[in-house]
């Protein structure tokens, strides 16, 4: 029996087998959650920011087909589309790594459902200033963990995986 379903969305110029997404998938499986990792690679070839609306459409389709409690998780652009889609589907939580509050050239700023949300972001993120994420998370009172790392959170993959496992357990306690 699975506790729920996790959809893990990779960042731009990444893929479904990327290090962070793979680490989270392993934690989901070990924790009794089914999971999937949509491949946005072909969509992302559309340009600097890829086709964000096509990413959203694919994630929405996958989320609507999911059974049981749904958690959306993502890194960078994957976090952005996960947050946006969370407002359109029934979702029990969000796990966002390095989420951009805005993406230049995209008309929609970051918005998310009012569900339990955990954000991990790097103090030294070279693409998304930590203060921008603090400013976005503060009025929502989301849990925000700032780590001594850059945008890829490369030095904190295991840390992110542990936080994700703890987050899954906390969601289960509330279901």
Region roles according to the model:
Residues 75-79:
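Active-site loop->helix "elbow" adjoining a glycine-rich segment at hydrolase catalytic centers
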Residues 17, 126-132:
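Conserved alpha/beta-hydrolase "acid-adjacent" motif
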Residues 90-102:
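A conserved short beta-strand
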Residues 113, 119-121, 125:
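Short beta-strand/loop motif that positions the catalytic acidic residue
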Residues 54, 154-169:
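Post-His helix in hydrolase/transferase enzymes
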Residues 71-72, 94:
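Conserved alpha/beta-hydrolase fold motif
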Residues 2-69, 81-84:
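Serine-hydrolase catalytic machinery in alpha/beta-hydrolase-like enzymes
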